[in-house]
């Protein structure tokens, strides 16, 4: 067993040989930032000040060779070879909210488009799930694999969990959900997970950018804000290939109609002039850049494909956004 000291906070925890640094930190109740937990998003990146680690497989875009040479590590993939002293951010807002393993029952299935289904999971009657708006769950499958999905409802909605599932061609789990898994099926989950959640203590206006089912955590955040009368200005940008891919568009339109602090800007990238679309066209991050010449006064949440998240971060920071005000959740597809 190896010992880890977080230098900037003084917190310590032990790591068993079978664990990554992140797994051990979560078990110890120490909240490091993280997203995908499989080396794809880079949210858990920090610095090794002393000691050595071995990395599991990860994507080069999440940790470059130059960063690795400079002593950076992805804590979701890093396994200590000796005692460590590390430097990383910690998240105070989720202190006291530890992930738990729970049984859930499929309560309701509703297909919203060719490849998106809403899944309502019912919790046991004696259980309540405490979470932050925007966090995610993981299904624990019988073969040992895990599948992660963002929570789409707000924390005040008790007793159930809403998920938005995109069907992935050849994807074992999502094809089961769409084609084989009936209502009343019992599954196991671990929840809540992730450091992508609404920072309620900030008072800056918010830009939210959602691609595809990246809308799920954004929906939870906005409904949480409405319920708690958090009236900060919100600019909601949704990106999709075609207008038909903007599921729950009517809900977003209602938010913008009845909530004066919410503006809704849907953007499609692959439509043509004969598709009856009279809204914005192009790339969703580019629409943000066109509308906001100076991003220095904003807080930004981006959720969707890793490529979209990466280019959004690069260009938004270049346009004045403080890097610490950029929060993201990159949706990566698990191996089939």
Model-found features: residue ranges?
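Short, conserved phosphate/pyrophosphate- and ester-handling motifs at nucleotide-, phospho-/glycolipid
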Residues: 134, 214, 305
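Ferredoxin-reductase
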Residues: 98-186, 204, 240-242, 267-271
């Amino acid at each position: 067993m190896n010992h880890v000291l977080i230098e900037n906070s003084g917190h310590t925890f032990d790591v068993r040989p079978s664990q990554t640094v992140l797994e051990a930190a979560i078990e110890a109740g120490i909240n490091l930032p993280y997203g995908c937990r499989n080396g794809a998003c880079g949210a858990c990146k920090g610095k090794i000040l002393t000691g050595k680690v071995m990395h599991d497989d990860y994507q080069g875009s999440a940790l470059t060779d130059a960063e690795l040479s400079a002593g950076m590590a992805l804590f979701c993939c890093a396994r200590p070879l000796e005692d460590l002293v590390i430097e990383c951010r910690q998240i105070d807002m989720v202190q006291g909210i530890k992930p738990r393993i729970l049984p859930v029952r499929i309560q309701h299935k509703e297909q919203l488009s060719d490849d998106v289904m809403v899944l309502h999971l019912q919790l046991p009657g004696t259980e309540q799930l405490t979470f932050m708006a925007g966090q995610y769950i993981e299904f624990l499958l019988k073969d040992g694999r895990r599948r992660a999905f963002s929570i789409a409802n707000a924390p005040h909605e008790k007793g159930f969990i809403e998920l938005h599932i995109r069907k992935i061609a050849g994807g074992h789990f999502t094809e089961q959900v769409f084609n084989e898994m009936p209502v009343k099926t019992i599954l196991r989950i671990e929840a809540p997970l992730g450091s992508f959640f609404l920072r309620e203590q900030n008072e800056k206006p918010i830009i939210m950018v959602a691609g595809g089912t990246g809308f799920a955590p954004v929906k939870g955040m906005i409904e949480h804000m409405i319920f708690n009368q958090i009236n900060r200005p919100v600019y909601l940008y949704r990106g999709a290939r075609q207008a038909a891919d903007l599921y729950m568009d009517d809900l977003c339109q209602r938010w913008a109609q009845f909530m004066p602090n919410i503006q809704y800007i849907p953007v499609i990238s692959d439509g043509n002039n004969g598709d009856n679309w009279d809204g914005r066209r192009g790339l969703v991050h580019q629409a943000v850049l066109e509308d906001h010449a100076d991003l220095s006064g904003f807080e930004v949440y981006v959720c969707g494909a890793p490529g979209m998240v990466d280019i959004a971060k690069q260009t938004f920071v270049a346009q004045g956004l403080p890097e610490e005000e950029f929060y993201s959740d990159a949706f990566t597809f698990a191996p089939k």
